[in-house]
UniProtKB/Swiss-Prot annotation:
Record-given protein name: Copper transport protein ATX1
Protein species of origin: Arabidopsis thaliana (Mouse-ear cress)
Subunit (UniProt): Interacts with HMA5 and RAN1/HMA7.
Outcome of gene disruption: No visible phenotype under normal growth conditions, but mutant plants have increased sensitivity to excess of copper.
Transmembrane region(s): none
Gene name of this polypeptide: ATX1
Highest taxon of source: Eukaryota
Amino acid sequence: MSQTVVLRVAMTCEGCVGAVKRVLGKMEGVESFDVDIKEQKVTVKGNVQPDAVLQTVTKTGKKTAFWEAEGETAKA
């Protein structure tokens, strides 16, 4: 089932953006993604699990959390 996962990722430069794009490009099930450095926002669409996307982006070393973490417990 296709779904959208939105993350807040601490990115400070194009190198950060490139690292996030690289890991998402290799992730199975990802159909498309958008990385917005100004908003610190990463939107991923595809047949993916939110926790798996969070863990994959966290591997870049960037501080990562679900976009709307209020009321949710994010496990990293």
